[in-house]
């Protein structure tokens, strides 16, 4: 999540009572609406928008205190639009990205892709590619920390 709060270091607890915006039908919306994660403070208000670009406009204009979105997407927005936001020190959620294949696909693409990704990780290719687009690429390759 990004915010314009005037704190040097920003933690989840700093979001208590604040207005948060998420994109509709996303994992952040699901987590915040469920209200079952004790690590997430009670927000003053939770707003959802169908289009994620609305989140950035609302944050830029000060209509919301923070947004919750994938960190890579926020970093890309900041780079593309010369925006200056801060990211929470503690992630709200760590997720992997999946690739789906048809159940009846017999080409073995899932195994080939898994093998290729493992080789790219082992030889540093994946780190090099991610590093071209994002600072601190190791942070985005911490897939071993994910639950199976």
Residue map of PLM features:
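Hydrophobic residues within well-ordered alpha-helices
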Residues: 15, 58-60, 99, 113
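Beta->alpha turn/N-cap motifs
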Residues: 6, 23-26, 52, 68-77, ...
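A ligand-binding cleft/hinge motif common to bilobed small-molecule-binding domains
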Residues: 31-35, 58-60, 64-94
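Short, small-residue-biased leader/transition segments that mark boundaries at the very start
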Residues: 3-10
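Ligand-binding cleft/hinge of the Venus flytrap
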Residues: 12, 26-49, 78-82
């Amino acid at each position: 999540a990004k915010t314009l709060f005037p704190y040097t270091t920003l933690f989840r607890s700093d979001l208590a009572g604040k207005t948060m915006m998420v994109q509709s039908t996303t994992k952040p919306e699901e987590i915040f609406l469920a209200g079952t994660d004790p690590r997430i403070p009670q927000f003053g208000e939770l707003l959802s928008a169908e289009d994620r670009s609305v989140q950035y406009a609302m944050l830029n204009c000060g209509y919301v205190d923070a947004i919750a979105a994938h960190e890579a997407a926020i970093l890309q927005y900041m780079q593309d639009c010369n925006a200056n936001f801060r990211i929470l020190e503690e992630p709200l959620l760590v997720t992997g990205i999946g690739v789906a294949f048809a159940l009846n696909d017999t080409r073995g693409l899932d195994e080939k892709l898994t093998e290729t990704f493992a080789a790219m990780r082992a030889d540093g290719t994946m780190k090099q590619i991610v590093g071209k687009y994002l600072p601190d690429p190791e942070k985005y390759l911490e897939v071993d920390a994910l639950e199976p």
